[in-house]
Amino acid sequence: MIRSIQKKWYKYQQAKKAKSFDSHWYMRFGWLEQPFTSLEQLDSLFEIHSPRKFTFADSFYAYENDRHFIFFEEVDDEHPVGFLSVLEVFKDGTYTSPEAILKLGYHLSYPCVFKIDNTWYMVPETFSNKTVELWKCTEFPLKWEKHSNLLENIEAVDSTPFYHEGLWYLFTSTRRDCKKFGDRLDLFFTEDILNPNWQEHPMNPVCKGKIQYRMAGKPFFYRNKLVRPSQDSLKRYGGHIELKEIIKLSPKEYEERLYETIYPEWNKEDDGCHTIDVHSNFVVVDAIRLTKKDN
């Protein structure tokens, strides 16, 4: 009840803010001097801003043949059907021009890339097609082909595979018995993600609340704790990221607790963040920047 009241207040505040400010999503990336253990390490990252009519968000990192790549969602403000792109980044903060890797007749976002043996795979968000899809890279990083549907006849967003103790788990947010994505978190598991026989976790939904459980990237270790990044959209869509410590994860149990909160305090003009990808000392995070409207 309290969050519902707070949400109405923040919605009013965001409507007022929209009258004076434009906003756009952009990406921040960089190499840290040591593995990610402190939020202050996010303050000095490089920035990648999109052309005026485009949006860059939902960023994921890939390292291949001593090269560094960021996969992400692009949206054209005039034709807001998301598609997926990639660019290469360098340690001096420079980067290549984006190249599209996947455009379909339905919205694509959240290109969660991961590697099995020597092959790259991707689970993009395809909820508007009522699927959770697995794509295989045939020529890195630009060419991809559909491998299979992991789940069908389901509205699910920000689906994130994670290999743990001999099993593949799929974290995802659905709208089953709730109004908005993020109100619940669901888990599925299988032994082989390439030839899956998904089982639904008996505790589903493993988390349930008010727009606070949607995935915000892949689980990673932070201060020697396994954490799951999740979005809290109380203030606005993509308001901030919460790091939830995963205490129990098995085919029978799931338990997490709030461990740390990431607010976009690196720049006073930023108003939110909703995806983070961490690999040892490399971090990429998206954020939303406000700019004063021209009078």
Whereabouts are the PLM-identified features?
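Carbohydrate-active catalytic/glycan-binding domains of CAZyme proteins
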Residues: 1-295
